[in-house]
Amino acid sequence: MAIQLPGFTMKNPLMPASGTFGFGEGYAKEYDLNLLGALVTKSTTLAPRIGNQGTIFADGPDSTLNAVGLKNPGSDVVLHEKLPWLATQYPDLPIIASIAGVDVAEYAAVAKKLSAAPNVKALEVNISCPNVKQGGMAFGTDPEVAAAVTRAVKAASSVPIFVKLTPNVTDITAIAKAVEQAGADGLSLINTFVGMRLDIATGKPLLDNVTGGVSGPALLPMALHMVYQVAHAVRVPLIGMGGISSGHDAAEMLAAGATALAVGSANYYQKRAIPKIAAELAAIQEGQTVL
């Protein structure tokens, strides 16, 4: 089922969520990345970031907690190495470059730089990372600040922009409306919830960062609700994500109002998660029974 989004067409509605897929190199050893509808890169900042140190992952029975901290090689490496590799290996695969920054100026600078790459069809503006001390989620919890980032990126970018929303707000529709009015061509939602786990023997947090972003199947009901709310509040297309791990989950997210879908932590548990979900979704849409 082909999907039309601003700036490009996807052969199917599924893509990896930013941060869970790197730049595709590892997963390219597992399957043909042309099976994806699009590929969303790891969030990139102007300069390299080493991310958070120490323990950055903690798994639960139905969720994963991470505090990676936007670790990335920086915009120069992405522009001159990562994106050209994708263009050479997968010339027909639409690339959505995820960008982040510590201030509005950095967002704009990265947007201008990466949107110039020939295979980048859109940008995803990450204003919702909960694991960094500067920037990140701070930009996504205030409608005026979120709108300011959106306007700056829109002015700097030569491709459509999708703003990635945080669920860690009282009213996600207020943020959605603000960034839509500021020029967003689409929205991605939801990013992770802030959470923590503790070692009951010591009483100390499992993560050195204390808190992290909660993802995984446990998020699906909340993600569906927020996508449903936003779909009824804005007119731009939505990339829905949060807890998708099966074709049934994907079908629910589309029913909630998403135009396209991103799969995150399921990639950690099963390398071929996206092709599996795509096949299950196609079967459901064709009226077949999926076990």
Curated annotation (Swiss-Prot):
Binding residues annotated for substrate, in chain numbering: 42, 66-70, 126, 191-192
Biological processes annotated in GO: 'de novo' pyrimidine nucleobase biosynthetic process; 'de novo' UMP biosynthetic process
Superkingdom of this protein's organism: Bacteria
Residues of the active site: 129
Cofactor(s), by name: FMN
Keyword Methyltransferase: no
Gene Ontology CC terms: cytoplasm
InterPro entries the UniProt entry points to: Aldolase_TIM, DHO_dehydrogenase, DHOD_1B, Dihydroorotate_DH_1, Dihydroorotate_DH_1_2, Dihydroorotate_DH_cat, Dihydroorotate_DH_CS, Dihydroorotate_DH_I
GO molecular function, one term: dihydroorotate dehydrogenase (fumarate) activity
Pathway: Pyrimidine metabolism; UMP biosynthesis via de novo pathway
Localization (cell): Cytoplasm
One Pfam family, short name: DHO_dh
Keywords of this entry: Cytoplasm, Flavoprotein, FMN, Oxidoreductase, Pyrimidine biosynthesis
Major place of residence: cytoplasm
Documented EC number(s): 1.3.98.1
Cofactor note: Binds 1 FMN per subunit.
EC top class named in words: oxidoreductase
PANTHER family: DIHYDROOROTATE DEHYDROGENASE (FUMARATE), DIHYDROOROTATE DEHYDROGENASE (QUINONE), MITOCHONDRIAL-RELATED
Xref: HAMAP family: DHO_dh_type1
Subunit structure: Homodimer.
Name of the protein in question: Dihydroorotate dehydrogenase A (fumarate)
The organism of origin for this protein: Lacticaseibacillus paracasei (strain ATCC 334 / BCRC 17002 / CCUG 31169 / CIP 107868 / KCTC 3260 / NRRL B-441) (Lactobacillus paracasei)
